[in-house]
Amino acid sequence: MPRRFVLFLCPLLAATPVAAEEPNLSAEGSATSGSATQLVLAQRVYRQATISGDPVLLLAAIRLARGIATRPAPGWERLGEGAPPPIPAPDRTGPPDQGSAAALKVLLGLASDDPNLQDLAYDLDAQVPQGKLPVATVAQAGLAGSAQDAWRVPLSGAVAAEIGLVGDGSGPLGLTVTDDSGAVFCAHPPAIDPALCRFTPARNGFFTVQVVNAGAEWNSYQLIGN
């Protein structure tokens, strides 16, 4: 290549801006709800059932929760340690387990005047899962009032992702998900109700999940993935 052409080309190359990394988001989403969506829905229905005292809603919440198996979230890294629990530590160890025996006991109490609903509750308790249940991953932590947490989460490209946040009900929690370029994929303002983010990464990568406790009290929460 002639030397004069090289000298002409160099300033052009130097003046060309480096393309910023594009957000790690696929245009193709998923129309199918996954395991994290089902658990978040179970928590929402459970909350409505406890507020209204409706045994039918509680039965639905238990069914939803028992239709999903859970395991610890592999590779989810909490960035730094959250504030230690206050002394004495709160009795709350996390959100209520909608599929627990305790929830079923509450259901039987609410349905004491309805034999048909009681039969449904007993049938639900006796049911054995048919086949392999869908699996949701769960990470649990606690957060002091007016504090925030951050998690680094690996996700696969072209695979629909779901990230849910469920608190213990002591105060409002906010949820934000960003990729390594800083692009915000999902932002839920603080609320008592569970939050859910659904998106599909374009490629393999890490994402930052931020949890904000806007309340004054300690909050034990769960992050749920599909």
Located regions from the model:
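Bacterial N-terminal signal peptides
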Residues: V6-T16
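Boundary at the C-terminal end of the N-terminal hydrophobic targeting segment
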Residues: V18-E22
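C-terminal edge strands of extracellular/lumenal beta-sandwich accessory domains
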Residues: P23-L25, Q118-K132, F207-N226
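Non-catalytic extracellular/lumenal accessory regions of secreted precursors
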Residues: Q48, I62-R152
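Acidic, Ser/Thr/Pro-rich low-complexity intrinsically disordered segments
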Residues: P55, G142-F206, Q210-N226
